Amino acid sequence: MLFFQRFKYVSHHYDKKLQYPVKIKKPDPRTAQIIMSQIGGADGELTASLRYLNQRYAMPTDEIKGLLTDIGTEELAHLEIVSAIVYQLTRDMKPEDLQKYGFDKYFVDHTAGIYPANASGIPFTASYFQVKGDAFADLTEDMAAEQKARATYDNILRLVDDPDVIDPIRYLRQREIVHFQRFGEAMRMVQDRLDARNFYTCNPSFDKKCGDSCPNRCSHK
C-alpha cells in the first residue's frame, strides 16, 4: 500500500513546535558550521523543499502532486529543525571561541543569525536544483537528492559526538530514506500509466493525451 494511502494529510496545518525536538545544552560553533550545509547547501533542506514544491505542478496525477506537496512541506519542517540545531549551538558562544573554531568569518556577516549557506560559506543558490517538467526526469532527481541528503547526514554523524546533536540528525537521516522510498513508489505510479514496452516514448507530464501531441505516438492507460 502506498504511503499517501496509509496516511491522510491535512494541507496548511502548522503546529507551533518542531517536528522533532531539539534541546542542545552546550554551544559548539565547529559543529554548527558543519551542520550549516543542511540549511543552505546543495543537498540541504531548503534546496529539497523548493525542488519538490516547484516540481509538483507538472506531475501527471493528483496523487503524485500531493506526494510532492507533502514531502516538500516536510522538508520545510526539517529546515526548521536544522536551523534550531545551528542556532542552539551558537547562541551562547564566547568571543574567544569564534576564531578558535573558525566561526569568525560567518560571525562578521551574520552574528548568530541563521543564513542559508553551506559549510564552506557559499550562499544558497537556486541552481542547486532543477525543475524539468518531466515526471521521469524530476522523480529521478528527487530520488538521487534524498540519497545525497542521507549521505550528508551520514558524514555529519561521523564528525559530531554530542548526543543532543546526534539524536535529531539521526531522525532527519531516517526521513530521507523514507522520502526516497516514497519517490520510488511515485515513479512506479507513472510507469503504470504508460506502455510498459517503452516508458520513455513521451513526456507523461506534458503529453496529456498521447496522440498528435506526442512525438512518438505512445499510449497512456
Features from the language model and the residues they span:
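Non-heme di-metal
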Residues: 2-221
